[in-house]
Amino acid sequence: MKKEIASHLLEIGAVFLQPNDPFTWSSGMKSPIYCDNRLTLSYPKVRQAIAAGLEELIKEHFPTVEVIAGTATAGIAHAAWVSDRMDLPMCYVRSKAKGHGKGNQIEGKAEKGQKVVVVEDLISTGGSAITCVEALREAGCEVLGIVSIFTYELESGKEKLEAANVASYSLSDYSALTEVAAEKGMIGQAETKKLQEWRKNPADEAWITA
């Protein structure tokens, strides 16, 4: 499944690999990869494959789930499709409470004691997903874990998720993506080496000249 989803993401341009012309993330870090999973919304067959895959992950790892929660905003649509497939209630969680109206951070019903799985589009450092998990825990929910479309497999992300004591599973990952890109002839050996070096230590820009 990992390579199938990776292939979909590459084909629709949801993921770009530019090891020779790095992107600059909002954090200022140079990166050979940029992921925009919002593009999956525009491709019915791709989003259906993602919804089916996320459902499979949830049934395998979190079979007692009672509520599906999407992260705002990128996880909302995927959470809705998954909850519909599983015939479960759905809510979504903002990064912070609204400054008007009821001031809700959680929209929809997620009640105390309910078992919740969070749906996220992308795991990089894990920050937005963890914010969602913490809000649900504060509301008294039992968060079983997180499922996502893609992960960069960054050590910093893994460490933050472990520190937050939350399990996380992704449909596809950086390793599968680079492998598929190489198989498709989208990157050569030199580019593959740069991509591998970046993942080892993203903060060290030595990978750019690797």
Curated annotation (Swiss-Prot):
If you read the UniProt record, what top EC class would you report for this enzyme, in one word? transferase
**Gene that this sequence comes from:** pyrE
Protein name, as recorded: Orotate phosphoribosyltransferase
Q: Which HAMAP family match?
A: PyrE (MF_01208)
Instruction: Decide whether keyword Magnesium is in the record.
Output: yes
Going by the UniProt record, its keywords in alphabetical order are:
Glycosyltransferase, Magnesium, Pyrimidine biosynthesis, Transferase
Q: Which BP terms in the Gene Ontology apply to this protein?
A: 'de novo' UMP biosynthetic process; pyrimidine nucleobase biosynthetic process
**Pfam families with a match to the protein in the record:** Pribosyltran
Q: Where does orotate bind?
A: 124
Tell me if Magnesium is a UniProt keyword of this record: yes
Q: Where does 5-phospho-alpha-D-ribose 1-diphosphate bind?
A: 94, 98, 100, 120-128
Q: Which reaction does it catalyse?
A: orotidine 5'-phosphate + diphosphate = orotate + 5-phospho-alpha-D-ribose 1-diphosphate
Identify the pathway.
Answer: Pyrimidine metabolism; UMP biosynthesis via de novo pathway; UMP from orotate: step 1/2
Q: What does this protein do?
A: Catalyzes the transfer of a ribosyl phosphate group from 5-phosphoribose 1-diphosphate to orotate, leading to the formation of orotidine monophosphate (OMP).
Q: Which CDD domains match?
A: PRTases_typeI
GO molecular function list:
magnesium ion binding; orotate phosphoribosyltransferase activity
SUPFAM superfamilies noted in UniProt: PRTase-like
Q: Which cofactor does it need?
A: Mg(2+)
List, alphabetically, the InterPro entries matched: OPRT, Or_phspho_trans_dom, PRibTrfase_dom, PRTase-like
Q: Which Gene3D superfamilies match?
A: 3.40.50.2020
Subunit (UniProt) = Homodimer.
Query: Belongs to which family?
Result: Belongs to the purine/pyrimidine phosphoribosyltransferase family. PyrE subfamily.
EC identifiers of the protein: 2.4.2.10
